[in-house]
Amino acid sequence: MGQDWDIIITNKSKLLSLDLHEVWRYRDLLAMYVKRDIITFYKQTILGPLWFIIQPVFTTIMFMFVFGGIAGISTDGIPQAVFYLAGLVCWNYFQDCLSKCSDTFNANQAIFGKVYFPRLVVPLSIVISNLIKMGIQFALFLVVYSYYFATGINFQINAALLLVPILIVMLGGLGLGFGMIISSMTTKYRDLRFLITFGVQLWMYATPVIYPLSVMKETYPKYIWVLVANPLTAILETFKYAFTGVGEFNWLYLGYSFSFTIIILLLGIVIFNRVQRNFMDVI
């Protein structure tokens, strides 16, 4: 008696293959991973999901005290709470996507070796679960933003607000792309796992999170190319400009960041697909 098979496992001959049809077929598994990531974050904690808000609030206060108060770094006339929180919302999303995606193979080697499913489900679930976390922090930003707006701060809201969803997708794409590349490399070079946290921290200081790009142009004009080459610079500057009307909004810089995101994402997919074929033999 013949049998009908719903799922056929075939050899992945194409390196540049998203296998989105397979990901969609396993959408229930994707949803389960997203739920697991969120629950795991605050499981057995007293405050639970409130940590999504507490972390950016206390970090913003620290930035206001250290960089705004002691160091006296300008925020281009933007209220410090709005300026720092805007940068943190974007940076935290990118950082979380990068850090967690970079541990995909090592953290899931047990299940990868036993059960078949499209491996892309795991890093995608990380990006989606962190998007939910970012949504909560973005709501916090809007509350703080609305407070200052109600007190008479003249924010110059503009059409760049329409780009905010694209900016968020770019942040997730960069985190996913870099994360897949690093995760693939750590299957052979375990030392990279210890460098990720340190490297990401340094990267934040090369990104206009605690300072505006205009200040760096005035203070260190010879080294501004380092910040411009950072694909996150245009994203954060455009995000701040969209809500305040202050910042460096440049279509050329933004186009560079968009192109960089596409390239890193495609490169990450190629390397990820290449490594997933035989990573169990390596690990």
Model-inferred region functions:
Residues M1-I283:
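Hydrophobic transmembrane alpha-helices and immediately adjacent juxtamembrane helices
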